[in-house]
């Protein structure tokens, strides 16, 4: 929370690098501690550990190359604040369902981190690492199946919130590159993107 506030108030190069370092740590923690240790009994836990490990490596690459500048973008503030609130709604919904730790969803579990990251990148979306977005949106689609398989209705929050975010990220990307020649054209790509998000 402190780094996020500082990123809004004093977006210095040091704060931006600290936020990226925190994202490396957080995604590595999910990969190693959460999936390899605490979820060791689950089937295919190592695949999920690799998935989150790749996201950690993408953030590490971003930290080294300074690809994502974290430039503030006010266009999607309302959706951003909703996404920021969701990691705190997750535990409340679990608690309302009568669950207690360690069975309840917490703020540092994969879905909560995915929602927070999408909100953060949407707030600073002048230029973002689309690879991180693609991985997180893929994770959000997996969340639909988790609702039924693991009986976690809270994951509907992640899945439903990411669909408009996916559209906005790519629309923003195409809007910034309208002057460039693309096949198909940016106009048709935008319509394809709308169709995919609706589907």
Tell me what each language-model feature is.
Residues 1-40, 199:
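N-terminal topogenic module of multi-pass integral membrane proteins
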Residues 24-30, 51-60, 114-120, 140-143, ...:
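Alpha-helical transmembrane segments and their membrane-interface exit regions
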Residues 25-33, 84-95, 136-148:
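Aromatic-anchored segments of alpha-helical transmembrane domains
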Residues 185-199:
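Internal/C-terminal transmembrane anchor helices
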Residues 42-119:
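Membrane-proximal helix-loop-helix units in multi-pass membrane proteins
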Residues 37-41, 122-134, 141-155, 174-184:
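Membrane-helix boundary connector in multi-pass membrane proteins
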Residues 12-24, 73-81, 125-136:
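Membrane-interfacial loop-to-transmembrane alpha-helix junctions, especially the N-terminal start
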Residues 44-49, 148-164:
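Loop-to-transmembrane alpha-helix initiation sites
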């Amino acid at each position: 929370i402190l780094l996020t506030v500082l990123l809004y108030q004093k977006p210095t190069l040091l704060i931006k690098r600290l936020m990226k370092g925190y994202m490396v740590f957080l995604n590595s923690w999910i990969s190693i501690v959460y999936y390899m240790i605490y979820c060791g009994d689950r089937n295919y836990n190592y695949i999920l550990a690799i998935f989150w490990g790749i996201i950690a490596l993408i953030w590490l690459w971003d930290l080294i190359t300074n690809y994502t500048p974290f430039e503030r973008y006010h266009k999607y503030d309302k959706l951003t604040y909703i996404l920021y609130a969701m990691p705190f709604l997750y535990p409340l919904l679990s608690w309302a369902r009568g669950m207690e730790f360690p069975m309840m969803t917490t703020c540092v579990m994969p879905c909560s981190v995915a929602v927070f990251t999408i909100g953060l990148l949407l707030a600073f979306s002048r230029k973002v690492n689309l690879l991180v977005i693609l991985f997180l949106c893929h994770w959000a689609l997996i969340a639909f199946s988790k609702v039924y398989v693991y009986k976690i209705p809270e994951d509907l929050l992640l899945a439903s919130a990411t669909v408009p975010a996916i559209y906005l990220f790519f629309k923003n990307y195409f809007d910034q590159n309208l002057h460039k020649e693309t096949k198909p054209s940016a106009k048709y790509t935008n319509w394809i993107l709308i169709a995919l998000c609706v589907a």
